[in-house]
Amino acid sequence: MTSHMAREVAEIPTAAAQFLKLSAGDVQAAAEAMRQADPSLLVTVARGSSDHAATYLKYVVELLAGVPVASVGPSVASIYRRPLRLGGAACIGISQSGQSPDIVEMMLAAGRGGALTVAVTNFADSPMAQASAFCLPLRAGAEQSVAATKTFVTSILAGVCLIAHWQQDTALLNAIDRLPDAMEKALHLDWSPLSARLSRAQSAYVLGRGPAFSIAAEAALKLKETCGLHAEGYSAAEVLHGPSAIVQAQFPVLALAVEDAAQTHVVATAERLAAQGADVFVTGAAAAGATTLPAAPALHPLVDPLVTAVAFYAFVETLSRRRGYDPDTPPHLRKVTETL
């Protein structure tokens, strides 16, 4: 029997194409407002997988626009009730449901503090959307699996589209148009060597840098949620500042080495951990002592990690079932988590 997660992962290319077609006007309106506001700071508001999406957008904004990005803790508004001075800033809130009270409170507080607010959500009539000046509706359709997949991908797509239009970056816009086809190819990549290794694992590291760091964090979360596997996502630099101390013989490591300026550094870390005895797997690049996993053809350094996320989702759904789990219903979790 096909899981909801498998079906929803398979729907990602169509969902991406649907967003690009139906939400273009929403993106352009928000991008024009961003150009008019010309923010000197951008803050993000999100939790869980949505916060990983926000981390992805942090790197895209900083690398493309040169504007610093900070994640704001929703509890600053929802529990501590501290106003923030955000004049001259923009605020992007990301939430699949748009319902969590802390996210909604922070978006309201950001607007009161002077920020231009943009909501990214699958529900255009949600409280978060209503609390924001602009909304980018994902239009991804129903997502029944507790583990977010297509809404994670389309949330990043929405943000990258916004940033590309804000900066009027033709190369990135052209790459975005080709994403649905690249995502379709990613669904069929063979990561079975990694599946065989993680089928019996208890712990793992997932590494990346730049936008791929956010995908590493998301991959580690999905390994916990759907596979009952204790995994941690790290920057391929940060892992050397302490966490690598526990990497010994046969410790599994997945390194996401997309084609960007950081690739050689990710490969160098992978080789160092392999030399410590780790079982290292690297996407899209060769590393001494490591197993290379296939990657989809490169489009643009700022979208290639998103394509890698699609390949990972297809992989982790099968790994979940291989380990005897139901990927749709992780223990102790619900689809919509509302926190203060």
PLM segments and residue spans:
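Generic C-terminus detector
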Residues: A298-L340
